[in-house]
Amino acid sequence: MQRDYLIRVETESMPDFKRLNGLMIGFVIKGEAHIYDENNMTQCNSGDIFIINHRDLYRFQLQQDGIICYIQFQMKYLADKFDDAHCLYFHLTDATTTKNIHQLRNIMARLVSTHIRHNELSKLTEQQLVIQLLMHMIHYVPRTYHSNQSILNDDKVNQVCDYIELHFHEDLSLSELSEYVGWSESHLSKKFTESLGVGFQHFLNTTRIEHAKLDLTYTDETITDIALQNGFSSAASFARTFKHFTHQTPKQYRGDRPAITENQQSAQHNYHDRELILLLNDYIEEMNHFIEDIEKMNYKEIAFKPTNQQLNQFNHIIQVGYLRNLLNTQYQSQLLTCHHDFQVNEVLAYDVMPYIMKKLNAPFTYDAEISNIFYDIDLCLDFLLDHNFSLTMHLNQYDSRDYIDAFKVFIHHVALHVSHRKDLKFNLYVTTLHNALIEMIDYFKALFPNGGLYIHLDQATERHLPLLKRLEPHIDHFVFDANSNDAVDFNKMNDDEFKTASQMIINKTNYFIDLIHRHNLKRPLILLNWNTLTGDTFITNGEYFRGGIIIEQLLKLSSKVEGIGYWLNYDLHVSHCKNERDYMNSIELFHQYNGKRPVYFTALLFNKLTSNILYSDDTCIVTGTDSNFQILLYDAKHFNPYLALDNQMNMRATEMIHLNINALEEGMYKIKHFTLDKENGALFNLWRKHHTIHGMDKDSIDYVNRMSFPKLEVYDIDITDTLALNIKMITNGIHLIEVKRYPSS
């Protein structure tokens, strides 16, 4: 309603000071304007925004051809929208980002333009934009709460003023309000005059008259109706009071402003509506949303302090199943992409000895002069050597004589094949322990002295301590698995189980650290097969976005494990699983058609962090130096993944984080802001939208892969001391902000 807020375009100066009841925000459309308060003058040029807060004294002076527009919110309207509105004080500072200034101006330009056009849907659009403007101010404009502003030196007088401004239309008396604040009438009257320079009744009548002016200007209601709805007992009483304050009768005041309609009131002076709309169009940009769906506000103040903490990056181990899969050019491309994006340099392949034993025991004999039984293996080794990948091979059921003989033939051939080239980093991985491993590892180490032995740990490991002790000199790493889904019955809604599941990976890690320390077998750990909560089906695994949960686990593990394992892609992973539950034991980086899953981008963003930790808390870590640092913020909510499938119990929530980085060196900084959440980088959202009963064609595949990336925003900002960031965090989302100061010129 027009009485809730005013939308104005001004082309003439305002000669006298007024005290504002409510909140005003505007900007200079053209030319130059001087905005005055009690103590200062602010010069505003085209595009500059100004804010006038509740009870501020203000006036403006427009220079030649100057035009300003503003939206003035009445205090009663603001009080209906949020608590303590009368205490809210907005202030634009150097820390208010250019992006947020643009967005505020964009909303206001749209709002004023819509107001001027006055078409069929103007009212509805106008109200949407008004709410958007308020929401944007609340979320992105720095503010404080002034419970006692400078013009009032007494809290109780402040309370009385607030009460009058919200209840001016009611029958108010000094007696009633003195009882409201617990003072005598004489004491309240004295304090009121001391604080405001006018008496109680004068302030009450001024407030009522200002609201009555709005009704006279913007409504066709009768004088009597206007009098009664603004707190006057009769039309005669209203007319007397109105003339005392304005030197006009209500009828004369309305007559001086004939037929001012809402679309006409903005086109003052020499400007027509079309000219104003053209000027406003220069400030209008595309907007993604009308309404911000923020459910929670969070404030972080960060100042960097010296710390001895270090963040360790992981050695990533990629499982490819059978070694021959390395001959697939698509898989090769995926490995090279991982190597480029987050330094993947180790491949884990299944045991090749059954394949070699089959060839060695074939019913015909291979002629070494015209054939090579290791031909395809050599091609795989060449790919690894060409791109500096190390090879880790899983040895399985190796306790037979035939197996050991085949193993020696294979190892001897590999040693010969790589002898003329740079060394291949070669590791062996065993999940079961047999005495035959002693003979095999001795032979292996003779040919590959830098080769490693990986031993899998589980609850049965302690039964093999004597053998472990004998192998200890050769052991490089211990390997273990941890799957959070094992801790939960997904058919139940037991919060305790989900709380336990959230700690499953770190608790299992600590268990094995304690185990190897107790037996003096200290070696680095590799977490090979692992997963966070996903549910126990393919559907929940895709629909339940968990980027923040994964990054939370990586941060907790970075000081405890050296290596992290992934499957390369969905097809390889699922082809080596017995059932859906088995599939949930591990995570893959790629889906089909080279689509990158969010875990891929999680690893990529984690890899952008540097080792020196400047700050950390439960949902944030900052690494780097004070002039070149990375801010990682994340949300990690562990809940039943099946709730992600229920539209009636949608667990998506949005939090606005106001982050201030203080005490930065003055200068120009470059900001790169990556956002990974269910709206930015979640592959399955787009996949399902573009998948038909016949699958996906090339255009759909290319589009989905092109769009399934984290959002990236890049901009420069001039910082004097504080970097202020406003971050919209969706459930289990991740934000990485890279901040780098440009060298001084």
Curated annotation (Swiss-Prot):
Pfam families reported for this sequence: HTH_18
Coiled coil start-end: none
Protein name, per record: Uncharacterized HTH-type transcriptional regulator SAS0078
Residues covered by the HTH araC/xylS-type domain: 158-256
GO terms for MF: DNA-binding transcription factor activity; sequence-specific DNA binding
Keywords tagged on the record: DNA-binding, Repeat, Transcription, Transcription regulation
Gene3D superfamilies from the UniProt entry: Glycosidases, Glycosyl hydrolase domain, family 39, Homeodomain-like
Location of the DNA-binding region in this protein: 175-196, 223-246
PROSITE patterns named in the record: HTH_ARAC_FAMILY_2
